[in-house]
């Protein structure tokens, strides 16, 4: 495979400076370019802006948009190099106006008056084609024909945590949580599993399987097929956990402008706290966080739009709980774009002994720039529901209105017929930078039943509490059944430059058959004063018993720098302070220091000192996170006069593939196995703690499905003798794919040899160095220094002295090469 190495590039640049002689010289390409073994290329003009003949793996760009990686064979006359009509079609270039008899078109022909340029150093070919002849793509979007299925592999992403607290007044408390997100990818199919284990104190631990399904994406349908245990969509009906089959349009296969929103969970921890997020009765996220504001944006939710129950357990044992609504305004689709979702199976609701078979279908269609219609049906034994709705894209924002009719007949013969109506609103006012997001109001009549209501009504005498859960799924029937009105909204406003931003969110609910209502309001203001950032936050909550809770928080963060990034690395340490007030006045204060250290920024640390007004208690704490190449390890400790608290966790990933078993410090749903044989300690995409192992392999997660993912290796901190030939690659995987990205390397041992001719003169710069078989293994550099690469020490090498007269000399070695010695070429 033809490859230009960094050293060869430098040598070529030097050779071009001797244009009068070198332009007509003959050079072997094996060493300088790294391919084409045993081939000689004659009369190559090195000053021409053309690649040498051979086969290349090239990233092709059309009008600066990546269109995929292709094998191109450059002919002896580069002007005759051509591409087939099939490749041209995949590039998105219209070839209808070309002569029908031509099946392979030269570059000059296909650019149709435009231009093309090579950049062999990074294996890139750019075509500039008149826009009228190009199928335009949204920035970052990749056509389906360039999506990669990936390789066969087994993987698991794990998280293990242990939390311990010891209170003088009440004794100790222990909790264990383990979660595995695993997958088996085989022949383009993917088996996904999400399982967890929870244990508190002396209660027996409980294993739960949240999801287990087989999946495959289909580019022709722009959709995904799943079979197994999973959740239905929440776009039209409430999400239902079930066992069966589901076929749906994967909106991420479409350009970015048609993507869905994802929830964001945020709050403020007063100490080293344990944040637990539950959905549908399953713990979907648990993490220890240091004192101060936290924001969780990497949730992997299987349950669609079910609300999130969040609990923050502080070091002193106090627990704050709140609800994060998870509902979205139905997508306003582009004209002619549709979204479908079909599901059939049997409900698999946790804790319910009586389940029900059902079929669900949903469909959305964008008629024009103003109107999107949608509808759906849910049919089961003794239950049905139908929904019709419309979304309008108006000048005052996106508005959707829908109505649902339900019929439920319970096992005891009771019949309930009801209706539910919803109005949702979403708007961004660009002139004022105001965003109204997910403002939604829903009213349900007394006898309206969701499918979850229907199933739980038939199980209301059988459910039991799971002591391992903060909010058990059984609490659904007691707390959420019979919802009457529900209103949620959030607004954010960017103020004029220098004035910061403000956000407001609210949630209000009431229920049939219950007096009172629950209300929750949150208001925050954030800004920066030079380098100092601060946030003012206020919240007010009312429960159904008219109990009111108010909180006000002031958070300040100040960065301090040291190091000049030359003699010492530049570092930052942050000093923060968080003060909270409640109905009684001052409640707590926390002061902390945090930062990052390590040669590869692999350690994050924090220390804090907090004081609680209640009990007049002062607590000291510390936390440390180690981002190792093979795992992420975290530990925390807090102590006061009345309690001690400690927590530890380890997370990471294990990947088994044909090249072996590799460890990663984290693993997401879609990831890459980057393979650079012989290159050790090279880091990926600027993440210095994520490095290649001794075999040159590193796992890189965070790949975006169906999009360009740029992968780069940095060898500046690597002392490997192997040479990396091109450090950048691009991949566009299917969702859930494990993509193998191979980097070309030269693992032959490098030698630097000092040598002179027998008459004491220097050898000619730029001449080849050949082994005893006549194969090129190196070149003469400046100062009569030879650079060669070999798998083993050669008995001797030959160097040309005068090519026109065919004169050469030989350097003889012993069993080893002494790089400190001056050799004589005789």
Curated annotation (Swiss-Prot):
One of its GO terms (biological process) is pilus assembly. GO terms for cellular component: cell outer membrane. The keyword DNA damage does not apply. Residues 1-22 form the signal peptide. GO terms for molecular function: fimbrial usher porin activity. InterPro entries: Fimb_usher, Fimbrial_membr_usher_CS, FimD_plug_dom, PapC-like_C, PapC-like_C_sf, PapC_N, PapC_N_sf. Keywords: Cell outer membrane, Disulfide bond, Fimbrium biogenesis, Membrane, Signal, Transmembrane, Transmembrane beta strand, Transport. It is a multi-pass membrane protein. It comes from the Bacteria. It holds the Pfam family Usher. The keyword DNA-binding does not apply. Induction: Expression is negatively regulated by H-NS and subjected to cAMP receptor protein (CRP)-mediated catabolite repression. Disulfide bonds join 809-825. It is found in: Cell outer membrane. Disruption phenotype: Deletion of the operon under classical laboratory conditions does not result in any major effect on E.coli capacity to form biofilms compared with the wild-type strain. Its main location: membrane. Part of the yehABCD fimbrial operon. Could contribute to adhesion to various surfaces in specific environmental niches. Probably involved in the export and assembly of fimbrial subunits across the outer membrane. NCBIfam families: PRK15217.1. Belongs to the fimbrial export usher family. The operon is cryptic under classical laboratory conditions, but is functional when constitutively expressed. This is Outer membrane usher protein YehB. It comes from Escherichia coli (strain K12). The lineage of its organism: Bacteria, Pseudomonadati, Pseudomonadota, Gammaproteobacteria, Enterobacterales.
């Amino acid at each position: 495979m033809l490859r230009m190495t960094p050293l060869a590039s430098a040598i070529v640049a030097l050779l071009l400076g001797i244009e009068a002689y070198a332009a007509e010289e003959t050079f072997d390409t094996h060493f300088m370019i790294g391919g084409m073994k045993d081939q000689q290329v004659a009369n190559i003009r090195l000053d021409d802006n053309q690649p040498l003949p051979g086969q290349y793996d090239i990233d092709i760009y059309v009008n600066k948009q990546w269109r995929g990686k292709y094998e191109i064979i450059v002919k002896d006359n580069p002007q005759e190099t051509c591409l087939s009509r099939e490749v041209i079609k995949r590039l998105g270039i219209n070839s209808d106006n070309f002569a029908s008899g031509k099946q392979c078109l030269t570059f000059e022909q296909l650019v149709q008056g435009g231009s093309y340029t090579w950049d062999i150093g990074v294996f890139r070919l750019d075509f500039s084609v008149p826009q009228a002849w190009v199928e335009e793509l949204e920035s970052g979007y990749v056509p389906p024909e360039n999506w990669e299925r990936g390789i066969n592999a087994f993987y698991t992403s794990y998280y293990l945590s242990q939390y311990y607290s010891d209170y003088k007044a009440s004794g100790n408390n222990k909790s264990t949580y383990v979660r595995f997100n695993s997958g088996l990818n085989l022949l383009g199919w993917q088996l996904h599993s999400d399982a967890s284990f929870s244990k508190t104190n002396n209660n027996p631990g409980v294993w739960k399987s949240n999801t287990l399904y087989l999946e495959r994406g289909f580019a022709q349908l722009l959709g995904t097929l799943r079979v197994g245990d999973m959740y239905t969509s929440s776009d039209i009906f409430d999400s239902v956990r079930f066992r069966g089959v589901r076929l749906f349009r994967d909106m991420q296969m479409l350009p970015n402008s048609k993507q869905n929103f994802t929830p964001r969970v945020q709050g403020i921890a007063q100490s080293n706290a344990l944040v637990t997020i539950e959905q549908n009765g399953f713990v979907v996220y648990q993490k220890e966080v240091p004192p101060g504001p936290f924001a969780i944006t990497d949730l992997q939710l299987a349950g669609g739009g079910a609300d999130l129950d969040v609990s923050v357990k502080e070091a002193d044992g106090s627990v704050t709980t709140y609800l994060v609504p998870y509902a979205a305004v139905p997508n306003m689709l582009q004209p002619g774009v549709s979204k479908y979702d079909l599901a059939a199976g049997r409900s698999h609701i946790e804790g319910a002994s009586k389940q029900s078979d059902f079929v669900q279908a949903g469909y959305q269609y964008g008629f024009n720039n103003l109107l999107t219609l949608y509808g759906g049906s849910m049919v089961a034994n003794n239950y049905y529901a139908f929904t019709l709705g419309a979304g309008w894209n108006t000048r005052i924002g996106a508005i959707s209105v829908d109505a649902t009719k339900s019929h439920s007949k319970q096992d005891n013969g009771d019949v309930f017929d009801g209706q539910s109506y919803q109005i949702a609103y979403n708007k961004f006012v660009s002139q004022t930078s105001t965003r109204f997001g997910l403002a939604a109001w829903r009213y349900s009549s007394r006898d309206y039943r969701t499918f979850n209501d229907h199933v739980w009504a038939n199980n209301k005498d059988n459910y039991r509490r799971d002591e391992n859960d903060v909010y058990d799924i059984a609490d659904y029937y007691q707390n959420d059944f019979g919802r009457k009105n529900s209103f949620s909204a959030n607004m954010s406003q960017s103020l004029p430059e220098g004035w910061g931003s403000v956000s407001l969110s609210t949630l209000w609910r009431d229920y049939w058959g219950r007096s009172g209502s629950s209300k929750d309001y949150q208001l925050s203001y954030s800004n920066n004063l030079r380098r100092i950032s601060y946030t003012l936050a206020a919240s007010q909550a009312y429960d159904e018993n008219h109990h009111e809770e108010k909180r006000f928080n002031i958070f300040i963060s100040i960065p301090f720098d040291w190091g000049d990034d030359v003699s010492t690395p530049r570092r930052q340490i942050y000093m923060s302070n968080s003060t909270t007030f409640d109905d009684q006045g001052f409640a707590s204060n926390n002061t902390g220091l945090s930062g990052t250290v390590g040669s590869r920024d692999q350690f994050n640390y924090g220390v804090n000192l907090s004081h609680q007004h209640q009990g007049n208690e002062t607590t000291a704490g510390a936390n440390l996170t180690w981002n190792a190449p093979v795992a992420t390890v975290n530990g925390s400790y807090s102590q006061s006069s009345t309690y001690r608290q400690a927590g530890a966790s380890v997370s990471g990933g294990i990947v088994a593939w044909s090249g072996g078993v590799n460890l990663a410090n984290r693993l997401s749903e879609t990831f890459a196995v980057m393979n650079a044989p012989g290159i050790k300690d090279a880091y990926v995409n600027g993440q210095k703690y994520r490095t290649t192992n001794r075999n040159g392999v590193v796992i890189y997660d965070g790949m975006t499905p169906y999009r360009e993912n740029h992968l780069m290796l940095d060898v500046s901190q690597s002392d490997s003798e192997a040479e990396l030939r091109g450090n950048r690659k691009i991949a566009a995987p299917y969702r859930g794919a494990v993509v193998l990205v191979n980097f070309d390397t030269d693992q032959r041992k490098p030698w630097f040899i000092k040598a002179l001719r027998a008459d004491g003169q220097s050898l000619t710069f730029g001449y080849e160095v050949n082994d005893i078989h006549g194969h090129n293994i190196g070149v003469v550099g400046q100062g009569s220094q030879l650079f060669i690469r070999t798998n083993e020490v050669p008995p001797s090498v030959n160097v040309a002295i005068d090519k026109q007269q065919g004169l050469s000399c030989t350097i003889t070695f012993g069993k080893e090469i002494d790089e400190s010695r001056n050799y004589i070429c005789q």
